Structure formats: C-alpha cells, structure tokens
A protein has these predicted regions:
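Structural detector for helix-capping/boundary residues
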Residues: 46, 60, 73, 121-124
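Hydrophobic pocket-lining residues within nucleotide cofactor-binding pockets
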Residues: 48, 70, 79, 99, ...
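Nudix hydrolase/Nudix homology domain
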Residues: 36-38, 104-167
Length: 167
C-alpha cells in the first residue's frame, strides 16, 4: 500500500499585458468579474497555454479581452504572487505592448461576462492596492513604475530562451 502524501500544488502561469499607446500616457486597466477577487482591477491577460510563446499569449489575451491589436510586444518583468489564505499562487509574466493604431485604438469589452469596462488609466492613479488584482499590488508595493523604468535591455526579448523553442 502506498503511503498517502499531501497533494502537491503547482503555481499557475499567467501573462499580464501593460498596454500602452502613443495617443495616451496611460495603461489599459479593466474591472474584473469572477470568482477570485470579484471586484478588482486588472491588466488584460490570462493563462499561458501549452506551447504558446509569451508574446503570442499577450497578443491573444489582449485581443480576446479588449479587442486591441498590439505591436512592439516585449517582456517587462515577472511577479510571483502567493496568498496562502486564498490558496493562490501564480507566476505572472508581464509583457508590455503598444496599441497598433492602424486598427481601432480604443479598448472594447469583448468579454462582458468576465470584465467590466476597460479604461486608459495613468499608472500613478491606479486604484488602491486592495482593489488591484494580485500581480499589480506586488508591483506597486515595490515602487515599480513600468513607464519610468529603463527596460531597454529587454526590448526584443519574447521569452524564446528555452530549449526547443519555436521561431
């Protein structure tokens, strides 16, 4: 008879997207509906699917949720969010992408069952920490401001560093 081991939990992996625009000195922020943190604000994003590159996930999720086409998508940073009392542990890969203004440059609520409206919000004016979805409070608590930080060393990096990656 095999000994009973406690279940092994693994963190989820999501991609969040800091959507910017040459027409706005802001970032797209939406009001979340759902089972976890039902009244919180979030960036566009979602689960990374098997074999998907980070850039592809950022493009797909932003289109599915906010009906925006992106260009110049690149890695920004990673946030490890763990909240024991909620049994919540996600690694969020944050990508930064600019709205492609050759398409409609304004966000639309493409998933009204999951999200409220999407709005352009200055980074400094994001909602209070307790109203932000998990990865955002981690960034804000660390004083991170992706609009002021030098991420030039990451431009062009799309997460293709793994063995056997697609090009």
């Amino acid at each position: 008879m095999a000994c009973m081991e406690p279940p092994r939990w693994h963190p989820g992996i999501t991609v969040g997207v800091m959507v910017t625009s040459s027409r706005h000195p802001r970032c797209v922020l939406g009001k979340r509906k759902g089972s976890v943190e039902a009244v919180s604000f979030q960036l566009p994003g979602g689960h990374l699917v098997f074999s998907e590159m980070w850039e592809e996930c950022a493009q797909r999720e932003t289109w599915e949720e906010a009906a925006l086409h992106l260009k110049n998508i690149h890695f920004a940073l990673v946030v490890n969010s763990f909240v024991e009392k909620e049994n919540y542990h996600y690694v969020t890969i944050l990508m930064k992408g600019e709205v492609n203004v050759t398409h409609d440059p304004e966000p639309k609520n493409a998933e009204p069952e999951k999200n409220g409206s999407w709005e352009w919000v200055p980074w400094e004016e994001f909602s209070p920490l307790d109203q932000l979805f998990w990865a955002l409070p981690c960034l804000k608590e660390q004083g991170c401001n992706t609009f002021k930080e030098d991420l030039d060393h990451l431009v062009g990096y799309k997460g293709h560093h793994l063995w056997g990656t697609r090009r």
